[in-house]
Amino acid sequence: MKTNFKEILENKLSINSYLWPKNIDPYEFIESILKAGIKNVGLHIDFIEEYGINKLKEELSLNRINVTSINSVGYFTDQFYYKQHEKIFNYAKLLKPDVVCIISGGILGGPNPISTEYNLDNNVLNIEKTRKDSLSQLLYLFKKAEEQNITLGLEPIGSWDIIKKGHFNSISSCLNLVKKNQHKLIIDLYHSFTDIKLDSFLKNSPKLGLLQFSNIKFDDNWRPIGRKILNKYNNINNLDLSKYLKSVLKRKDKINLEFEIFQSDIKETDPKVIISNLKKEILQLL
């Protein structure tokens, strides 16, 4: 029997609040996804705090919007960001996301920009030591999350971003870290599109917690440098997005698809137009 992608997409499609500009009322983001018939949302901390956690919880409950992800905890190489996990776990207990994203943080400390607190040892990037040090912090977060019935989603980060974004980089290595606990992986196509395990993991693994997707922007040397919306005049989809989306849509479980793009990627493009067109553009790819 032919798969009814349109019907499945109605329930599985999510969109992340990262695309929403700070100068537009966050309420209009929720209003926009409701108008577009999108039933799920990914949230980042700045958006949650701008909206107000209690007001946001009420709005999501009233409109029966499911939270697919809260972003992010971790950042093991930057103590300021690492210490935010207690606050974020408290948000998660109220908003009940499918997963809370873990980003491991860059070798030189935390998220962009690179931390000024980090010191190189003899000007050497000691990747092995950094991963070993981070492992104990990761296991601590796993334990704390389990105590509060929160599922974490560890996100493999593309190796080209090891300096400033994340130092757990492959699906296989991240899978080893969650195989004996309740936690899962978030697969972001921007970071994992080159991974040798991507296809089989998306199709079959019970450890998939969420697929985040967008089109990818490459520079003149075909290095990934950002994200693009799916369809626009002269906008080529360089990845076979259809294949990856279908892999998740054909699964019999409740794994969702979260469109993730940043405000810095879309610049002056009206986010409301992106949201209203998203479902149609995905179906055109399928």
Model-derived features: positions:
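Conserved beta-strand positions
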Residues: I15, L43, I70, I102, ...
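Catalytic-core regions built around general acid/base machinery
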Residues: G52-R64, Q137-A145, S200-F201, L239-V248
